[in-house]
């Protein structure tokens, strides 16, 4: 082994392979670019992004951690989302959910 050498696996690395993927068409109707990070709760993104929010509660972008998707004004893209893992609780962002995803869905938005 050489110091600093990378030894990589021969097979591809699969992220979120066991998660249900939701595809959503998104349109930026605003006049400014909007960038969404990999772990941002997509339900709570900028209101200038138009899409069916009811299908994205509890989900984030299906992209590598630390990356983002950028929507220029007028851009329309189909993106992939995956559900959060763990306890299915979301806190912060725009404080729309602030708790259990299932409870939020049941009590109505």
Swiss-Prot record:
Could you tell me the superkingdom of the organism this chain comes from?
A: Bacteria
Locate the transmembrane regions by residue number.
Answer: none
Q: What is its main location?
A: cytoplasm
Keyword Zinc in record: no
Which catalysed reactions does the entry list for this protein? urea + 2 H2O + H(+) = hydrogencarbonate + 2 NH4(+)
Q: Report the GO molecular function annotations.
A: urease activity
One annotated Gene Ontology cellular component of this protein = urease complex
Pfam families from the xrefs?
Urease_beta
Q: Assembly and interactions? A: Heterotrimer of UreA (gamma), UreB (beta) and UreC (alpha) subunits. Three heterotrimers associate to form the active enzyme.
Q: Which NCBIfam families match?
A: PRK13203.1 (NF009682), urease_beta (TIGR00192)
Similarity annotation: Belongs to the urease beta subunit family.
**Name of protein:** Urease subunit beta
| Species whose genome carries this gene | Bacillus cereus (strain ATCC 10987 / NRS 248)
Taxonomic path: Bacteria, Bacillati, Bacillota, Bacilli, Bacillales
């Amino acid at each position: 082994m050489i110091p600093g050498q990378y030894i990589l696996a021969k097979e591809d690395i699969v992220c979120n392979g066991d998660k249900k993927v939701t595809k959503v068409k998104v349109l930026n109707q605003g006049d400014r670019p909007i960038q969404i990070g990999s772990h941002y709760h997509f339900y709570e993104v900028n209101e200038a992004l138009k899409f069916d929010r009811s299908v994205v509660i509890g989900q984030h972008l299906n992209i590598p951690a630390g990356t983002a998707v950028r929507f220029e004004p007028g851009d329309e893209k189909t993106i992939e989302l995956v559900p959060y893992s763990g306890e299915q609780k979301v806190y912060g962002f725009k404080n729309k959910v602030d708790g259990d995803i299932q409870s939020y869905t049941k009590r109505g938005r």
